[in-house]
C-alpha cells in the first residue's frame, strides 16, 4: 500500500500551451501552483507567464473550471523565482521538446528542489533515462516521466514512465495523486520513443495517410470513414491533425523517424510531400484558419491533391460501406470489409490490419500488458475500443491468419512477422483473469494499488465484467441495488437516463424502500449522462392527444418525486457526471447533497423548449434565495444571481461553474475522477447517516420578492427584447419564470409555503405547454436535437 503523494504546492516549468494548461488543471483541483518561464525581455520579469495565464481564459475548450481561478496561479521566472521551488512537493517540467534545453534546466533547478519533492517531465517522447543523466544522485530516485494528453483538463490519460532508478513508492504516490486529485487514468509506459499513446496513435495516423494515397481517397472521405462510424471522435484523422497543428504533427513524425531507426516501419516515418507543402505555405491548421481543411464563408473546403487546390468537402462514406460498418457482429463486419472490392472498404481493412500488426509487434517493447495499449489509445485518442480489443472482438485467430496472409503476399506495410505469442492458440489478449503480458507470458490482473479500490466500476475492457450488485427493486424505469452494505443505489434504465412515468414512480418506491431497509440512497448512473431531463416525446404525445389533465398529473407527479427525494428520512445523494438537464438538475437540487464530477454540465434548460422548470426547480431557487437573504433581507438580490441562468437556459461548463450559476450549492462536492464518484457519494451518504441525518423541516415561511420583483425582472427583460437579445416568446417564458421565482403577484416580502410555489410552477408550465410555439420548440428539439428560437 502506498499513500498518495502529499502535494501542498506544485510548480510547472514552462508556460507554453501545455505547461499553462497543466498549471490550470492543478489549480482546478485545488493545488496551489507556481507557473515558471523565462524572464521577459521587456516589461515585468514575469511577463511571459502573465500573458500565458491571461490567455487561459481565451482557450476553447476552457482549461479552467472557472475563469476566476486564473488569479490563483502564481507567476514566476527562472532568474528571480527559483527560491519558490523549495516549498513545492511536485515539479512538472513542460518546456519545448529539446533534450539539451531540458537537461540545462534540470541542472539549474536541482539545488532548489526539496529533499522530498518529485520531479516529473511532461515530455511526449524523449528518453526519461537520458533526461535523468544530469540529475544529482539524491534526486534521481524521485524523477520520472508523466505525460499528459492535450487538453489536459479533458483527456483522461496520463502516461507514467519510470526511469531505471525511480523509487516504487514515489511512482505509487504520484499515481494515486494523478488518479484521485487530478482525475486521470494512469498507464505505465516503458521508456521508448513516444511511449504508448503517441507511438500507436501516430502510427495509426501515418498508416491512414499511406492508405489514403494507396487507395486514391480524399481527405474528407477518409475522415467520414475514420470517425464515429468506427467508434472514434468526429474529428477523425485529418481534422484532428488540423486541430493539433500540422507543424506539430510534422514534428512528432520527425521525432519517430529520428528516434526509431530500427523500426521495421521506419520508411513511413516521414512527412508526406503534401504536408510539407502546406506547412511551407503557412497553412498550419485550425490555429491559422487553414490547413487540410479551411472554412470559406459557411462552406468547408478541403485540399485536393490532384488539383493542388481546395475543393468543397463533400465526399462521404459510400452507402455499401456504411452498410458493412452497421453490421453488429465484428467478425462478420471485418470479413466483409476484407472481401469487398470497394476502395473505401479496402482502405479500412488495410488500416486496421497494419494497426493490429504494429501493435502486436511492438507490445513487448512499449508496455507491460495489452491493457496498457488499449486504455492509452482509448483515453488519449478518444477511441471507443483499443486496437487489441477491436482485433479480439473480430475473432483473434481468424484476423491473425488474415494478417499473416497479407504479410506473406506483400500487402502489409511491413514484412516483419507477427510475434509467436499471437499464434499460441489464444482467443485474445483480454479476459476475466487479466490482460496478456509478453514479458511474463501470462495474463496479469489490474493494479492492486489502494487508490483503485475507490473505483467500483472501472472503465471496462472487452471481456471484463464487474458484479452488478444485488437487485432490490426494478421496474421499466429504474433499478435499485446494493453491495451487501447499508447504502442503496438507484440507476435509470431509459435512453439518455431521461425521466419517464416509470422513473418517477420507481424513484418514489425506491425512496420508501431505502427509508425502511437502508441508511442512505445514491442516485447514480452506470454511464453518462446523469439525466437529459424529462421524456419530451411522451409529454408531447399527451399534449397532441389533448390529454391536458393527464399532462398536469405528470407534472404533479414530477414535483411529488422531487419532494419525496428532499424529505426522505434517509440522505439521498445525487452522483452527477455529464449532462444533468431539466428534471435531472431538479432531482440533484432536491438531494441532501450532490457529488458532481468536474465534467458535469448542469442546467435548467426548459426555456429552450418553450417551458419552465416545473419539477420543483423554480420553487427550490425561491427557497434558497429566502434562506440566503435571511429574515427581512433582500430576496431579489439573491434571485438575480440565478434568474438569468434559468431564463437563458444556461448550462454550466463544469461543476465549479455550476456553483457560480447557483445550480449547485457551496456545500456540494466536486469530484475529479468520475470513476470514483459512486464511492464518494456512498461515503457522503454514510457520513450523513452516521451524523444522525434528519430531513429539513418543511419550508412554510418562504420570503418572496413578490410583485415588485416581477416588475423589476420584466424591466430587465424589456431591455433585452428591445436590444434583440431575446424573441417575444422568450420574453413571455422568462416573465413567467420571474412570476414563479418571485412567488406570484403578492406583496414584496410576503411569506408563502412550498405548495404555493409548486402550484405556480404547475400553472405556468401547463399553460406554456399548450401554446403552439412551445409545441413547435419541443418538436424541433426532438427532431434536430437543437433549440428553436421562435
Residue ranges and their predicted role:
Residues 2-521, 525-528, 535-559, 563-570, ...:
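N-terminal glycine-rich phosphate-binding loop for ADP-containing cofactors
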Residues 586:
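Short alpha-helical segment that forms part of, or immediately flanks, the ligand-binding pocket
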Amino acid at each position: 500500500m502506498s499513500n498518495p503523494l502529499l502535494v501542498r504546492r506544485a510548480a510547472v516549468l514552462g508556460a507554453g500551451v501545455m505547461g499553462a494548461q497543466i498549471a490550470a488543471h492543478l489549480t482546478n483541483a485545488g493545488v496551489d501552483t507556481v507557473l515558471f518561464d523565462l524572464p521577459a525581455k521587456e516589461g515585468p520579469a514575469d511577463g511571459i507567464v502573465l500573458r500565458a495565464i491571461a490567455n487561459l481564459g481565451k482557450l476553447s475548450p476552457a482549461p479552467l473550471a472557472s475563469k476566476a481561478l486564473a488569479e490563483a496561479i502564481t507567476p514566476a521566472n527562472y532568474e528571480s523565482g527559483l527560491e519558490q521551488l523549495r516549498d513545492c512537493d511536485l515539479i512538472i517540467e513542460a518546456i519545448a521538446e529539446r533534450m539539451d534545453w531540458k537537461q540545462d534546466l534540470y541542472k539549474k533547478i536541482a539545488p532548489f528542489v526539496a529533499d522530498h519533492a518529485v520531479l516529473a517531465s511532461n515530455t511526449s517522447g524523449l528518453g526519461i533515462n537520458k533526461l535523468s543523466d544530469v540529475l544529482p544522485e539524491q534526486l534521481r530516485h524521485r524523477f520520472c516521466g508523466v505525460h499528459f494528453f492535450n487538453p489536459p483538463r479533458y483527456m483522461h490519460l496520463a502516461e507514467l514512465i519510470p526511469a531505471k532508478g525511480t523509487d516504487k513508492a514515489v511512482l505509487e504516490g504520484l499515481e494515486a495523486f494523478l488518479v484521485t486529485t487530478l482525475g486521470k487514468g494512469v498507464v505505465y509506459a516503458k521508456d521508448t520513443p513516444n511511449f504508448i499513446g503517441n507511438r500507436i496513435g501516430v502510427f495509426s495516423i501515418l498508416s491512414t495517410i499511406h492508405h489514403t494515397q494507396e487507395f486514391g481517397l480524399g481527405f474528407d472521405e477518409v475522415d467520414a470513414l475514420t470517425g464515429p462510424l468506427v467508434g472514434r471522435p468526429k474529428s477523425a484523422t485529418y481534422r484532428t491533425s488540423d486541430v493539433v497543428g500540422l507543424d506539430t504533427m510534422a514534428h512528432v513524425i520527425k521525432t519517430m523517424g529520428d528516434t526509431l531507426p530500427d523500426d521495421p516501419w521506419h520508411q513511413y516515418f516521414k512527412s508526406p510531400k503534401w504536408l510539407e507543402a502546406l506547412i511551407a505555405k503557412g497553412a498550419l491548421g485550425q490555429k491559422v484558419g487553414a490547413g487540410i481543411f479551411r472554412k470559406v464563408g459557411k462552406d468547408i473546403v478541403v485540399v485536393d491533391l490532384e488539383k493542388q487546390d481546395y475543393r468543397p468537402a463533400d465526399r462521404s462514406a459510400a452507402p455499401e460501406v456504411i452498410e458493412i460498418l452497421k453490421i453488429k457482429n465484428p467478425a462478420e463486419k471485418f470479413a466483409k470489409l476484407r472481401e469487398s472490392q470497394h476502395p473505401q472498404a479496402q482502405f479500412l481493412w488495410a488500416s486496421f490490419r497494419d494497426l493490429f500488426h504494429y501493435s502486436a509487434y511492438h507490445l513487448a517493447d512499449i508496455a507491460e500488458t495489452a491493457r496498457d495499449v488499449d486504455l492509452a489509445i482509448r483515453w488519449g485518442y478518444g477511441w471507443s475500443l483499443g486496437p487489441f480489443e477491436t482485433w479480439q472482438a473480430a475473432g483473434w485467430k481468424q484476423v491473425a491468419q488474415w494478417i499473416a496472409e497479407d504479410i506473406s503476399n506483400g500487402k502489409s506495410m511491413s514484412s516483419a512477422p507477427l510475434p509467436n505469442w499471437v499464434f499460441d492458440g489464444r482467443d485474445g489478449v483480454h479476459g476475466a483473469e487479466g490482460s496478456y503480458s509478453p514479458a511474463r507470458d501470462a495474463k496479469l490482473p489490474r493494479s492492486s494499488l489502494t487508490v483503485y479500490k475507490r473505483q467500483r466500476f472501472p472503465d471496462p475492457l472487452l471481456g471484463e465484467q464487474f458484479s452488478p450488485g444485488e437487485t432490490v427493486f426494478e421496474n421499466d424505469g429504474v433499478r435499485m441495488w446494493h453491495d451487501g452494505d447499508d447504502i442503496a443505489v438507484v440507476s435509470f434504465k431509459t435512453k439518455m437516463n431521461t425521466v419517464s412515468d416509470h422513473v418517477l414512480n420507481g424513484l418514489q418506491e425506491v425512496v420508501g424502500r431505502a427509508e425502511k431497509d437502508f441508511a442512505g440512497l445514491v442516485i447514480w448512473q452506470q454511464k453518462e449522462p446523469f439525466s437529459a431531463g424529462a421524456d419530451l416525446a411522451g409529454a408531447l404525445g399527451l399534449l397532441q392527444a389533448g390529454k391536458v389533465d393527464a399532462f398536469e398529473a405528470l407534472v404533479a407527479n414530477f414535483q411529488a418525486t422531487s419532494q419525496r427525494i428532499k424529505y426522505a428520512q434517509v440522505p439521498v445523494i445525487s452522483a452527477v457526471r455529464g449532462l444533468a438537464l431539466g428534471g435531472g438538475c431538479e432531482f440533484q437540487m432536491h438531494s441532501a447533497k450532490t457529488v458532481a464530477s468536474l465534467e458535469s454540465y448542469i442546467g435548467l434548460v426548459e426555456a429552450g423548449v418553450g417551458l419552465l422548470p416545473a419539477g420543483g426547480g423554480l420553487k427550490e431557487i425561491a427557497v434558497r434565495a429566502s434562506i440566503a437573504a435571511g429574515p427581512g433581507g433582500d430576496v431579489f438580490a439573491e434571485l438575480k444571481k440565478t434568474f438569468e441562468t434559468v431564463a437563458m437556459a444556461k448550462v454550466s461548463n463544469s461543476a465549479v461553474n455550476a456553483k457560480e450559476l447557483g445550480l449547485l450549492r457551496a456545500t456540494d462536492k466536486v469530484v475529479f475522477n468520475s470513476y470514483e464518484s459512486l464511492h464518494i457519494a456512498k461515503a457522503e451518504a454514510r457520513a450523513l447517516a452516521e451524523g444522525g441525518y434528519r430531513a429539513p423541516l418543511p419550508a412554510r415561511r418562504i420570503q418572496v420578492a413578490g410583485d415588485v420583483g416581477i416588475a423589476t425582472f420584466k424591466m430587465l427583460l424589456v431591455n433585452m427584447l428591445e436590444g434583440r437579445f431575446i424573441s417575444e416568446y422568450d420574453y413571455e417564458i422568462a416573465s413567467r419564470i420571474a412570476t414563479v421565482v418571485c412567488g406570484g403577484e403578492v406583496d414584496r416580502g410576503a411569506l408563502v409555503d412550498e405548495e404555493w410555489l409548486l402550484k405556480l410552477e404547475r400553472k405556468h408550465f401547463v399553460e406554456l405547454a399548450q401554446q403552439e410555439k412551445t409545441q413547435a420548440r419541443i418538436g424541433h428539439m426532438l427532431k434536430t436535437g437543437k433549440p428553436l428560437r421562435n
